[in-house]
Design a protein with these regions (language model features):
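YjeF_N-associated NAD(P)HX repair module
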Residues: 64-188
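A cross-family phosphate/adenosyl-ligand binding-site feature
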Residues: 2-82, 137-139
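Walker A (P-loop) phosphate-binding motif
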Residues: 16, 187-190
Length: 190
């Protein structure tokens, strides 16, 4: 994350919004590494969900880029309460939004919204691509997808899905990105 920021956002005001889990820890570590040389701020969401919304609104007002480190691929329940309000506030901010791992509120496996979710301009895939990035409706919330090399060996597993590239589908006519198999009556499985 820090290398990505150094390469792309050196002179920008950045706000890390960090949740209570591992994704939040990634944001806190990046903030700590950058805090001496970059214009960065942090807002943390504790497990008790005590939220100072005035502080968050002020931080958002005075930043250019928001890094969404609230929830990652481990999210397994619907977004509710203050977490929902925080995500809605970020989405309404008209600021550039970078999601770490996956936009908060999306399932990394199914691509489904878990209630509400972050509308990211960029998503930083941490180490490897998750299936949910390429499925609907997540595809519409991911923005530009950047794969970050974490310098760790990839897990040894045989994927049960494959990513098809443009070369594989040159002769298939393009369609609306939200189309599904029921809209046309036929499905082509590759």
């Amino acid at each position: 994350i820090t290398n990505f920021i150094k390469k792309n956002y050196e002179k920008k005001k950045i706000l890390f919004v960090c949740g209570p889990g591992n994704n939040g820890m990634d944001g806190k570590l990046a903030y700590n590494k950058l805090s001496k040389k970059f214009d960065v701020s942090i807002f943390t969401i504790d497990r008790n969900h005590k939220i100072n919304f005035n502080k968050l609104k002020n931080l958002i007002k005075n930043t250019e880029i928001i890094f969404d480190c609230i929830f990652g691929t481990g999210l397994n329940k619907k977004i509710r309460g203050n977490n929902k309000k925080i995500i809605e506030l970020i989405n309404k901010s008209n600021k550039q939004i970078v999601a770490v791992d996956i936009p908060s509120g999306l399932s990394g496996d199914s691509g489904q919204r878990m209630g509400t979710c972050i509308q990211a301009d960029t998503t930083l895939a941490m180490g490897f691509l998750k299936p949910g990035y390429f499925l609907q409706p997540a595809k519409e919330f991911i923005g530009k997808l950047e794969l970050l090399n974490l310098g760790l060996p990839l897990p040894k597993f045989k994927p049960n899905i494959k990513l098809v590239n443009k070369k594989n589908i040159e002769n298939i006519p393009s369609q609306n990105s939200s189309i599904n198999k029921y809209d046309k009556g036929h499905v082509l499985v590759i």
